[in-house]
Every structure is written in C-alpha cells, then in structure tokens.
Amino acid sequence: MSTTFDKDQENEQQQQDAQAIWKKILSPGARITKDDVDFAIDNLESAPDVPYEFMYATFSPNAKIYQPTAIAVSGVGGIIGALLALKRALQYGGPKYYVTTEEVIKATDQKSPLYLANYALNRLLKAYPAQVVVIKPDDFDKIKTLLSSGGVYISGLPYETLIPISQLSGFGRIWHYSPIQKKFFVF
C-alpha cells in the first residue's frame, strides 16, 4: 500500500532525476541526441528558468524587451536554446512561429547533420503548435512579420539570414542562447 509519504518521495526523486538530466543536456559541449530532444520536449516544464541580459542596456536603458514569439529551429547548435526560449514564450502566451530553413525541412535522413533539427521541429509542432516559417536571407516580408509579433530567438539560423533579421529588428527583439554562460543575450 502506497502512502502519501511514498508518493512525495517518488515525486521528489523524479524531480531530482529530471534536474540531473537537464544539467547534463545544458552542460557546455554536450552532444545533443534524439533522446535528449525527446526528454526536453516532454519535460519542458521542469527546464530551468534561464535569465537574460540586454546587451544595449547602458546606452538604451528604457528600450522595451520583446519576449520571444518566433523560435528558430534550424541547426544542431540552437535546438536546446530553442526549447528554453519556448519555455519562456509559453509564459507569455506561447510561440506564434517556428522559424526554419528549407534545408532543415528536407533533412529527413538520420545521417544528415540537420536531421535532429527536423526531428525537433516535428515533435514541437505536435506538442506546441505554431505556424512554421521557412525563411531565406531575402525574405524581408517574412522577417518583418516575425519581428512585428515580438522577439525572435535566432540561434542556429544561417548567418546570411541573421544579418537581415538583425538589421531590421531594432533593440530588444533578437534573442540568442549561450550554453557557456547559460543565459540569453538580447540585442
């Protein structure tokens, strides 16, 4: 017969296990696997709350910070940051868009370096539905739409796409996750 005390201990053990797995996933240089992506999506509520630093605070202290509503799921390096940005977005009404590239959409071969991003995107669409925006460097109308909805988490996007986004963004809209410092930088 299970008691309330036993259930409390079991819940506490599950929380400790989840925290240990998150710590492993978030460690700098961690090799992210499909199992890590599954765990992170299935246990998003137990993910740590990651702080952010506004990089222009010294010369624009009154700039508005726009919470991320568009989440880039486009490269291996940005997947875990994308999930942390998603957790933040869920606290402010959820994501409106997942931003990706044609290369990620086509990466269905498990040997492809972009397969994990494709897998994560498909899992996210089932768990946390949002519109998918496939972006190219010269898609200025799409970029304006993304920026008009709020902040954009950009880690993992190709550099040729980052430049036009950053040029059109203004202050407080661009989010980047640093696994070394374990925080978001907002530009």
Swiss-Prot record:
It is a single-pass membrane protein. The keyword Cytoplasm does not apply. One of its GO terms (cellular component) is virion component. It is found in: Host membrane; Virion. The chain crosses the membrane at residues 65-85. Keywords: Host membrane, Membrane, Transmembrane, Transmembrane helix, Virion. This is Structural protein ORF187. The lineage of its organism: Viruses, Viruses incertae sedis, Bicaudaviridae, Bicaudavirus.
